[in-house]
Amino acid sequence: MNLLITKDEENDTLGFFFEKCSDIVSAIFENSSNIKLLSSQKLKNDIIFSMTVSDPAFVPFNFFAFTHGNEDGLIVNNQNYVGCNWNAEYWTDANLVYNYSCLSALQFGKYAIKQGANCFVGHNKAIKVQTLPKYENYFIEPLKKFMLALSENKNVRESVNQAKIQYTDEIDSLYMTDMFTASVLLENRDSLVCYGNAEIIL
C-alpha cells in the first residue's frame, strides 16, 4: 500500500499536534505500507508534492493530511498546497483521501471525489484541539481508532464509525467534569463526514 502523509509540524499553534498525529499513523502502517512523508518545508514547494503524487511507482496511493485547511483545500504557511480548481490530475489515482483539517470536506473533499479519488474522509466544519498536554489524548484516540481499524482491514465506513464511537466514549468520560472539552469533541465528531465509496478496504 502506498501512503502519502503530509504534516505542518512548523505551524505555530498546532505543529506539535500535527507531528504527533503523523507519527502515530506512520507507526501503525510502517510494516504494511510504502510511506512517503512531506513535512512543512517540502509542502512549501509545489514541485515536490506534484512529483510525489505523479510518480508511476506510487499509484494508487492513499493520502493522509495533518495540516490546517479551508473550504478549498489544505494549507501550509497560510497558502493552499492542494485545493479545488487546480492539480485535478493528482486525485485520479487516489484511493482514500483523509484530512485532519478544518472545513476541507465542504468543497475540497467533493472535488477530490469528482476528480477520481475513491473515498474522502474529513471535516465539514472548523475543528478544534485542546493544546494542553492533559487533553491531548482525548483528541488523538479517535484518530488512532480510525487508523487501527483501517490497518485491520475494516472498510472506511466501519472505520469512521469506530472513530465516532471513540469520540463518544471520550465525550462521556468528560461530560460531568469538563463540559467545554466535551462539547468541542462533540462538534469534531459530528463534523466528520465520508464521501465516495466507503466500502473500500486499504
Model-derived regions: residue spans:
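A domain-level signal for caspase-like cysteine endopeptidase catalytic cores
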Residues: 1-66, 96-99
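Short acidic, S/G/P-rich loop/turn micro-motifs used as interaction or catalytic elements
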Residues: 9-14, 43-45, 68-74, 103-106, ...
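Well-ordered, non-membrane alpha-helical segments in soluble/globular domains
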Residues: 17-25, 46-50, 77-85, 139, ...
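Extracellular/periplasmic catalytic domains that process cell-envelope and extracellular macromolecules
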Residues: 56-57, 90-92, 113
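A short, glycine/acidic-enriched catalytic loop
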Residues: 69-93
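Ser/Thr/Gly-rich flexible loops in soluble cytosolic domains mediating phosphotransfer, phosphorylation
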Residues: 85-109
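Active-site-proximal C-terminal subdomain of hydrolase catalytic domains
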Residues: 105-202
